[in-house]
Amino acid sequence: MKRRTARERAMQALYQMDITGELEPKVAVENTLDEGEETNEFLESLVVGFVENKEAIDEAIRQNLKKWKLERISIVDRSILRVAVYEMKYMEEIPHNVTINEAIEIAKTFGDEESRRFINGVLSNIKDTL
């Protein structure tokens, strides 16, 4: 599985967890996989890592939102931001610009017309604080 695919699956897993409020991370990951597709370490680390660091990640996002509340952001955008912020804060081997570019590309696919610019702005602000 390519890293872009893993990031997309991680966003989908966080989306499911946000909607249901009760899925276990590994179950959410399994629900995103195509039949016969196997998970990988990167995908699982994104989802489990977010769950383990949810408070710090959400706080980093909150501190960089202008005129928005985290709870008012679309679930898709919130999920993309959460995956990207986890990656930026806890996966130091991945350059921040790579993470931001990947999040923007995922937003183009899954978000609305404004998602790309919104996510770019929030993540750029967060990058400056790390």
Swiss-Prot record:
InterPro entries given in the database record: NusB-like_sf, NusB_fam, NusB_RsmB_TIM44
Pfam families per the UniProt record, alphabetical: NusB
Gene Ontology biological process terms, A to Z: DNA-templated transcription termination; transcription antitermination
Segments traversing the membrane: none
Keyword hit for Repeat: no
Family of the protein in this entry: Belongs to the NusB family.
Protein name: Transcription antitermination protein NusB
Organism for this UniProt entry: Bacillus cereus (strain ATCC 14579 / DSM 31 / CCUG 7414 / JCM 2152 / NBRC 15305 / NCIMB 9373 / NCTC 2599 / NRRL B-3711)
Gene name in the database record: nusB
